[in-house]
């Protein structure tokens, strides 16, 4: 009998280490859970009629270049936050400095804010009980993110224009990016 395929060990290698301690610990926990993840096949009920099986090859495990250049749209009506290959680009972003609004990259978070971000991520779909026959690949995002974005709105805060989060992913070569965006909105806030 053929053994069930599991995720390549290349996906289990640690990513960058520039995050606060609580986010690094969360990422380590998620990566540990991936070690035993059995990948779906055509015999998996939810994948039964899939034309192709899931191929997560070693070259896809590599992180896309963090210094990739992209052109940003300037004709948008509103505020923008730009992520390139899963990493926030403050210099390409345009968002307000407004009392009651906090927009921070994960790597710039204080330990208290990093703990809030980790707690929000722990409430994600990856911590929900899996349905019989389902495969939870959301653990992959929690194990591989390099950076992320925490948007916090205090109660009653109103942002006067839309806030667009723009993801750019370069496709020069194989690899992957794992953007992570968390919004903590207080009562009666508007974004």
Q: What spans do the regions from the language model cover?
A:
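Glycine-rich and polybasic anion-binding loops at the starts of cofactor/ligand-binding domains
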Residues: 1-191
